[in-house]
């Protein structure tokens, strides 16, 4: 990667910035009055903790004012990046589509509406890739979020955005009724031909589709029943005919651990699902949100739309599930005069904010396909990643420090040097301030809301988190394959910096919250130390 020419003293320091437990190099000999040397002294106790003895650290702090690195540790080594990948995914969408881009979800009629209000034809919702056909819609053309997104379920701190998850679907149905439609003789369809539906994103396993209703999730809030042995309480949102839940989970004594599973998921002949809830939930424990990922998002949306139409007094029949296939003959009807309902999304800038603040895997995984569909739909030789690569190459970035196969970070690797140079590139763009504000804020919101909330750096470090972990059966513990942090801060002295912090392969206990408590807080300490030390 092209780097600014540095003085011999700076280059010597960068080469010596690691100690043996961090990568095998010699300890720095620079005077303790040097900010980088003082930073090294502050970081060493963090990285020398016993829990990191088998881990590998990679760090770079980059001066945006001087266009040069001021501290680096293993800067050119590739690290498993996890959700810091979303910095590239969202940045690409922001640069190529623009902050003001809006999704237009239209509902078309394929036939005439007679005087009695009968639509003699089909009603077709054409999916536009809008990722927020949900209750995220807020006043002022904005999108809401909670710090612990409902996609990361089964955690006591997880919650859904307050409001109606079918808000947009109901609004579309109301518009159809307002057009005088009282009965539909044809089918109610959802056209998802924008890109192929069916693949599951690599983070939380939600099915990707051009239509996204409530993040393609059904939220179940499960709590204890009235007594030990009683059935648990279950609140479903949204409740539709697409899925029926059979509750076989029971209430256990206080002090036990909640354990809820979907023990079976049966597809019925009509395309609906019957899901059995099994497991236990203890007395005295606050209800917890669990999310069911719908297997066929287009069918889910179709059922929800038919339900909403009926609520508005429109007679509509739910077609057989097999009808929801192939849309080659429909686009001829997609003309302005046939629009009977339309939803225009808030600007893309709001979507970028949601994806980055809460690390929304479905949204990030879908963005490369959306960018491709919008900008190069008819060019079968190009993918969304081809468009991203072209942007990065035009920026002059060395892609030898980057590997990416999905939008969310389920399988991606970046070097700290590549990441800070990418962030430096984004900091020079017209939407730089918007991009930075969209990042989680240390100790304040998003996935950093509970990281280092009481240090001077809290409220001043804007950075995307990344976490990838799996069960280590041999040692009965959790292996944090990757933990990362990438973003920006302005020092108390007014200097601007980009940062990339990675640590790979850290073993932690299975206790809930151990990854955040041990590894997440440590990365926050590193960022906070840089904020307090660099000029």
Where is each model-derived feature located?
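Positively charged n-region of N-terminal signal peptides that target proteins for export
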Residues: 1-7
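Bacterial N-terminal signal peptides
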Residues: 8-20
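Conserved serine DD-peptidase/penicillin-binding transpeptidase domain
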Residues: 26-49, 95-399, 493, 521, ...
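A short, well-structured edge-of-sheet supersecondary motif
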Residues: 48-73
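Residue-level preference for non-acidic, small/hydrophobic
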Residues: 67, 86-93, 188, 211, ...
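Small-residue-rich helix-loop
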Residues: 70-72, 167, 176, 365-535
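Short active-site loop at a secondary-structure junction
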Residues: 72-92
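A short glycine/serine-rich beta->alpha loop
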Residues: 74-79, 291, 408-409
């Amino acid at each position: 990667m092209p780097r600014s020419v540095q003085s011999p003293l700076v280059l010597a320091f960068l080469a010596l910035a690691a100690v043996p437990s961090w990568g095998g190099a010699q300890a720095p000999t620079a005077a303790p009055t040097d900010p980088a040397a003082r930073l090294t002294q502050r970081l060493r106790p963090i990285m020398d903790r016993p829990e990191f003895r088998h881990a590998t650290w990679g760090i770079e702090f980059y001066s945006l004012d001087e266009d040069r690195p001021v501290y680096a540790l293993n800067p050119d080594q590739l690290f498993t990046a996890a959700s810091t990948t979303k910095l590239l995914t969202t940045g690409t969408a922001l640069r190529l589509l623009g902050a003001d881009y809006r999704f237009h979800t239209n509902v078309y009629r394929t036939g005439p509406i007679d005087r009695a209000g009968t639509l003699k034809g089909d009603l077709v919702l054409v999916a536009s890739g809008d990722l927020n056909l949900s209750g995220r819609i807020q006043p002022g053309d904005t999108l809401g979020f909670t710090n612990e997104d409902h996609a990361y379920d089964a955690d006591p701190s997880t919650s859904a955005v307050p409001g109606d998850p079918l808000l947009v679907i109901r609004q579309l149905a109301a518009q159809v009724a307002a057009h005088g439609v009282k009965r539909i003789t044809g089918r109610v369809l959802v056209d998802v031909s924008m890109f192929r539906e069916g693949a599951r994103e690599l983070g939380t396993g939600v099915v990707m589709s051009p239509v996204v209703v409530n993040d393609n999730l059904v939220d179940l809030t499960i709590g204890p029943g009235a007594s030990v042995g009683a059935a648990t309480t279950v609140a479903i949102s949204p409740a539709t005919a697409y899925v029926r839940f059979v509750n076989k989970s029971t209430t256990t004594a206080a002090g036990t651990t909640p354990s809820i599973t979907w023990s079976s998921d049966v597809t019925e002949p009509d395309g609906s699902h019957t899901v059995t809830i099994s497991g236990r939930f203890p007395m005295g424990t606050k209800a917890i949100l669990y999310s069911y990922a719908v297997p066929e998002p287009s069918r889910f949306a179709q059922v929800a739309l038919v339900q909403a139409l009926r609520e508005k007094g429109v007679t509509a029949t739910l077609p057989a599930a097999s009808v929801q296939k192939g849309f080659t003959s429909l686009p001829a009807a997609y003309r302005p005069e046939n629009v009977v309902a339309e939803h225009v999304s808030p600007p893309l800038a709001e979507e970028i904010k949601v994806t980055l603040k809460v690390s929304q895997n479905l949204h990030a995984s879908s963005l490369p396909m959306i960018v491709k569909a919008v900008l190069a739909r008819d060019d079968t030789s190009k993918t969304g990643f081809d468009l991203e690569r072209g942007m990065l190459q035009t920026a002059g970035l060395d892609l030898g420090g980057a590997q990416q196969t999905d939008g969310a970070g389920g399988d991606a690797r970046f070097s700290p040097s590549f990441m800070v140079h990418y962030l430096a590139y984004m900091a020079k763009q017209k939407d730089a301030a918007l991009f930075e504000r969209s990042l989680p804020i240390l100790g304040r919101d998003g996935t950093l809301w509970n990281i280092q909330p009481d240090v001077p750096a809290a409220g001043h470090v804007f950075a995307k988190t990344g976490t990838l972990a799996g069960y280590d059966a041999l040692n009965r513990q959790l292996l944090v394959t990757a933990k990362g942090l990438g973003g920006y801060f302005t020092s108390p002295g007014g200097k601007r910096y980009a940062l990339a912090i990675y640590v790979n392969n850290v073993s932690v206990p299975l206790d809930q919250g151990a990854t955040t408590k041990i590894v997440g807080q440590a990365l926050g300490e590193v960022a906070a130390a840089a904020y307090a030390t660099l000029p």
